[in-house]
Amino acid sequence: MYSSLNIYNQPVTLAPTTVASPNAAYQRMANFWGLVEDLKEGTYKIRSEHRKYLNQEPRETDDAYDTRLARSTVVPYLQRIEKMLSGMLVRKPIRLDDVSDLVREQLFDVDLEGNDLNVWLYQTARVAISFGHVGVLVDAPKDGEKARPYWVTYAPKDILGWRTEIIDGVRKLTQLRLMEQVVESDGKYGEKIVKQIRVLEPGRYEIHRKNNKGEYKLHDEGEMSI
């Protein structure tokens, strides 16, 4: 008999072999993240997975099962709790005391996507509440006279792996791999989405991009100040 419980017993590969291979901690949680994502999408997503979440009884006909499936709904408790708890963080605007005018101006668009600090916090908190944690990278490009720091949010499924070492008695992060998607121009009017993995190590970075064969190859590398 089909059992949807098998999705929670997937083997964990302890030794990543490529830059795109997630580490063990990622693999242990990946199947549970899938359930959270499906719940966030609601009734139609859960119905589309049918027997994964709603098992067919041993003597139940296909027609009877389809009828029961069509009547089944998912109450959006997860979305309600997520919005409620995130909203509590921004019920009042964030106070900015002893902040320079330059920084205050930047906080009106913290992610270069038009979101101010309050909106960014609300959206980031929703991800953290749903999946248990969230990653934030503050990048500060050097090029350009008006270059400024900006914040990038990474959902747990985009944090492929990390390494830590004890250096001078302190545990420090020595490697971080982040999955990203960038939009590039394609022809005169079109655009395409390119998947890439950003590898950060002390003092340097690498960008690996996915090619037509589905492999990630080194696209760019350089030095950085952290």
Per-segment meaning from a language model:
Residues 139-226:
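Structured, contiguous alpha/beta core segments that scaffold functional sites
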Residues 1-153, 167:
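Extended, helix-rich architectural segments
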